[in-house]
Amino acid sequence: MPELENPFQETLLSRHRAEPCTVVIFGATGDLTHRKLIPAIYNIAACGDLPPQFKVVGFARRDKTDEGFRTELEEGNRKNSRQGHNDELWGSFAQCIHYHRSEFEDLEGYKALGCLLDQFDVERGAPANRLFYLAAAPEAFKPILEMIRAAGLNKGVGDKWARVVCEKPFGKDLATARGLNAVVADTFAEKDTYRIDHYLGKETAQNIMVLRFANSIFEPNWNSRYIDHVQITCAENLGMEGGRGGYYDTAGALRDMVQNHLFQLLTLVAMEPPTDLSADSVRDEKVKVIRALRPLVGPEAVGKNVIRAQYTAGSVDGVSRVGYRQEDRVNPESKTEPFVALRLMIDTWRWQGVPFYIRVGKQLPKKATEISVHFKKPPQVPFATSTMLRNSENTLVIRIQPDEGIALRILCKQPGQAQNVQQVKMDFRYSSSFGKASPEAYERLLLDAMAGDATLFARRDEVENAWKFIDEIEHAWHKSDNPPTMHEYPAGSWGPKEADDLLRADGREWRLL
């Protein structure tokens, strides 16, 4: 009998080669362009993967020349390029960068942009694809999209495409997400809309599907029969640096991190195998996970399963930190949470009875994002001591950042006559196994958008179903007569005691990072 083909042997990491393209970045004078987007495009060029006859146009309100814009971007590239900065390569690369000044609401500015794009096509001798990247503030998305449509830039020239990439946050609740989706749908087809979440561009996040479905030692055990619980932690050791307090105080950890980044990781861990690796097949399974989340409705259910907290004054790495309400641009009476922990249940056959614990917070002891899958303990270990039995669970740890990799914790006998058993770690690290640093998330995602692969981008129904779940928690916090308590924790700790109690009530505890 012939061996069945494994569809995951051609993995999500397959390389793409895009056709000639112009990328237009709206909000090009902002931090994202300088720290992430231009260094990512430069790294793609350094690897030889940039499409031929490539162009970048920065679209923003400030007066700048092409040369002035290039000089500013060069400074950011020196600080942030994964490949390091090479003056000769930059000199060649910078010639593809141009600047276009316009207000976001000025139709004439978009018509002039269209003329510039047409001029590039004339210089190439043929039309090129066009990728519009919305890196501006969220409130600017609507006028930008409306002006793109009014200027006729949402249609490709000839047989070439026009696509849009939308940065997070994509709305601030279900109503605004639906409204924004409607505006996007009026301008671009869903197949040409790419809602970006940079966590999905990280190598280890992409590897979750391969780890699960291409390795027979894991998939048969990836269910409630063998898995006790799953933890997802995103810890940050910073607060509101860089003037983020103004934005963050209108969002909070639940909206800023859980609704997008951590739900994306959750769906990759919990999804069923897709029928193939097409974008919609993968995203169909991810949406099913979001829809299967057991709703948390009302203050009682939210209070029992969700812990929110603000940090008070403390120290991180020996540096004194002020409390959240004392941060610059934060309301002194703020009800916004920089820390949240959740206990979630997924009502599917595979995950019945398996809790998923999620926590994210600022001013914690270290910066780290990881997923830990905790397997059930064996029913009996004849040679085990009671102490060893308490620590006998096998754990699969997927490190998203830093030091991307995967570790499996197992039990082994210590050398010697006695039957002493100790937990040891089998560790895979990208840097040591492949001998080079992983590509930055934005490198992969930009190439995918240019190549037309939407697998690692959120679909409309995925975004809206995630907001539907989050809105119930926000409603219990801010619109109920008896809202759950806002707890506190000192900066430099691992969060409030109540977050520990959330697991202790189930006979579990957070994994030490």
Where are these regions (language model features)?
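Secretory/organelle targeting and membrane-embedding segments
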Residues: 1-166, 170-513
